[in-house]
Every structure is written in structure tokens, then in C-alpha cells.
């Protein structure tokens, strides 16, 4: 987080530092999280998560020490994840550590099995619980607590997931339009 405790756009939370710092792990719902060598790159340290038996089992990465500065236009974070299966819902939740009612949650779904991928989480698209929306993004809140939930909404059976490189991207990006051509015919009319 640079010289302050604000995770600015482009900054990354990773787990390679051997110096005790502001990033701590706290499990709930019978999750078990540990720092381990990346199973695909032993020079990198990642978080291993064994999914607990509760549908809401998760891991908090810091509480009350890092500020995640969401705004109306800066709503996107990414996390690099490894999942045993594709199609797994991963939820990120931000909240104020001093007021558990001040939250925002969003989901992403894995597309790869047994390999790393980067998932994008846009907090302007709040998650749902049993078809009901969770709290919408309120940029007046000071989010300083981040939790991750693997296979959210499903009972765990000790599956192992990994994550690393929590990044505050900031603004959502729009993919370029592909599959169409612009033909210039000299007078700005549609060409053929």
C-alpha cells in the first residue's frame, strides 16, 4: 500500500514478504487458511484455503488496517485464484470493521480448473443471497475489511483453493468491440 494504508489503484496485496505486516488472515465457518509455496511456482507465496463445511465459510484478509477506496467510478478489484473446478462462485466482501452493516459484496465465477486465473470483481454489481440483493455500494463507507469466500453458498467438503495478488484496479475497463469493420469511403457514409 505504498507509504500509507490505502490500497491505491494498481497496488497489490501479495503474501511474499517475510516481514510481519498489515496483512493477516482470519478464518470463519471452519475454513483453514495458511501461507504456502505456490504449487506451480515455489518462489511465490500464496494463501491455501481449505473450504469449511459452512456455506458462508470464508477468510478475512486484513481488518481495520488497509483502506479500499471505492468510489462511484473506481469499483473494480482482481484476485488471482486457483480452483479445483471451473464454475465455482467466488465472493469478495468489503466492510467497515467498526460497523458490520456497512458492506458490499460481489461475485465472480471460475472458468478454469486446476490452474491459475485472474478473476475480476466489480462492486457496482452487488451479489445476491437466495435471489435477494446484498447491500449496494455506498461510497460514503470507509471499507477496511476484505473477505473472500470460495464456492459461496455451497457446503464445503475440504476442497483446497489458492489465492494471491489482490489488486485494486479502480475503474472498470470496457473490452474493445471486435468482429466488425469500419470502412472509410471518403464521405463518411457506410461503405461496403
What are these model-derived regions, one by one?
Residues 1-192:
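Beta-rich carbohydrate-recognition modules and glycan-binding surfaces
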Amino acid at each position: 500500500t505504498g507509504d500509507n494504508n490505502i490500497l491505491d489503484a494498481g497496488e497489490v496485496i501479495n503474501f511474499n514478504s517475510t516481514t510481519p505486516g498489515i496483512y493477516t488472515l482470519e478464518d470463519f465457518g471452519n475454513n483453514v487458511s495458511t501461507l504456502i509455496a505456490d504449487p506451480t511456482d515455489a518462489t511465490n507465496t500464496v494463501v491455501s484455503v481449505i473450504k469449511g463445511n459452512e456455506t458462508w465459510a470464508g477468510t478475512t484478509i486484513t481488518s481495520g488496517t488497509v483502506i479500499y477506496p471505492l468510489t462511484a467510478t473506481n469499483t473494480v478489484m482482481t484476485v488471482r485464484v486457483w480452483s479445483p473446478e471451473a464454475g465455482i462462485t467466488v465472493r469478495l466482501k468489503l466492510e467497515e470493521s467498526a460497523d458490520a452493516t456497512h458492506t458490499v459484496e460481489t461475485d465472480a465465477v471460475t472458468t478454469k480448473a486446476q490452474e491459475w486465473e485472474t478473476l475480476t470483481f466489480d462492486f457496482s454489481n452487488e451479489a445476491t443471497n437466495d435471489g435477494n440483493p446484498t447491500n449496494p455500494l455506498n461510497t460514503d463507507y470507509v471499507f477496511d475489511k476484505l473477505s473472500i469466500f470460495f464456492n459461496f453458498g455451497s457446503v464445503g467438503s475440504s476442497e483446497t483453493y489458492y489465492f494471491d495478488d489482490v489488486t485494486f484496479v479502480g475503474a472498470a475497463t470496457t473490452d474493445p468491440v471486435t468482429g466488425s469493420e469500419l470502412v472509410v469511403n471518403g464521405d463518411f457514409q457506410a461503405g461496403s
